[in-house]
From Swiss-Prot:
GO terms for cellular component: nucleus. Keywords: Nucleus. It is found in: Nucleus. This is Ninja-family protein Os03g0419100. It comes from Oryza sativa subsp. japonica. Belongs to the Ninja family. InterPro entries: Ninja_fam, Ninja_motif, NLS_NINJA_AFP-like, TDBD. PANTHER family: AFP HOMOLOG 2, NINJA-FAMILY PROTEIN OS03G0419100.
Length: 307
């Protein structure tokens, strides 16, 4: 019985049974039932009742898109409204974003202004340093003129000292040389303005400077000969070392200094570079006072240690 009622409700027979029981509507042929045909409607509502006498409040579907709007229950026209333009989403308010752009433009203007001021300052400094250069050039020309005057005075003195350098009319040759070509005179002025070379060794103030010795073939030959002399000297002064036994004994190297007949024997130690007698050399090695110090000294004739 329950299954028949259930099928009757969904099959359309429930309406006749309800009309027979007195629960139907006053108007015949019009039913107040909601259609459950699962048909999609505008606004996201299912089973919309299009009858004008349906006055029940229905829930409208909410939407996150502004262009989707629900159909009002009071309006019978199911056509949607005109879509609204999509708004731009922003994480910052409009006022804050405008303030940020305004601040950035102001910073850019300040930077451009500072850059322009620096450029103007550089140009002004460069223009102020330009007038000083002619003064320096004038000073250089004055020095050149003074050198030319000294040179002309010296040339006149030399021409007066040497009568053969004078012409038949008695005028000095240096006066005629002044009428040379401008290029030759300019070269002379440049040469006179240059400082004296190292070959003369005499600067303008008259003091003589000591020249640095040049390495020539003769100096190399002298160096080679001196090296050979050192080898000969080392052959004459052989290498010696101490031979001391005991807890305080140590080996000290030295060489036998060249001595002549009748002179005392002296040994120079390598560690301190001092001259000692044989007894002092053995004592320096930690042997103490010995009766025959020459027995504690070993002679090594090889001079390769010092070469």
């Amino acid at each position: 019985m329950a299954s028949r009622d259930f099928l009757g409700v969904f099959g359309g027979g429930g309406g006749e049974r309800r009309a027979a029981n007195g629960s139907g509507s006053a108007v015949g042929g019009e039913s107040d039932e909601i259609e459950l045909s699962l048909g999609l409607s505008l606004g996201g509502r299912f089973g919309t009742d299009m009858s004008p006498d349906a006055k029940r409040a229905r829930l409208a579907r909410s939407s996150s898109i502004a262009s989707v709007c629900s159909v009002s229950a009071a309006d019978g026209d199911p056509s949607p409204a005109a879509p609204l333009p999509l708004l731009r989403t922003s994480s910052l308010p409009t006022e804050t974003e405008e303030e940020r752009w305004r601040r950035r433009e102001m910073q850019n203007r300040r930077r451009l202004e500072a850059r322009r001021k620096r450029l103007e300052r550089r140009i002004s400094v460069g223009s102020s340093s330009v007038p000083n250069k002619p003064g320096r050039e004038d000073g250089g020309d004055g020095a050149v003129n003074r050198l030319q005057l000294r040179r002309s005075i010296g040339s006149q003195g030399s021409s007066s000292a040497n009568p053969q350098d004078q012409g038949p009319d008695g005028s000095a040759i240096c006066q005629s040389t002044e009428a040379r070509s401008p290029s030759t005179s300019d070269d002379t002025n440049q040469n006179s303005a240059l400082p004296p070379t190292a070959s003369t060794g005499k600067p303008l103030n008259g003091t003589v400077t000591q020249q640095s010795p040049l390495r020539t073939l003769g100096s190399l030959t002298m160096r080679t000969s001196s090296t050979g002399d050192i080898g000969k000297i080392m052959m004459d002064m052989p290498m010696v070392s101490s031979k001391v036994e005991g807890p305080n004994g140590r080996k000290i190297d030295g060489f036998l200094y060249k001595y002549r007949k009748g002179e005392d024997v002296s040994i120079m130690c390598v560690c301190h570079g001092k001259f000692h007698s044989p007894a002092e050399f053995v004592k320096h090695a930690g042997g103490g006072d010995v009766s025959n110090p020459l027995r504690h000294i070993v002679v090594n004739p090889s001079p390769s240690v010092f070469l």
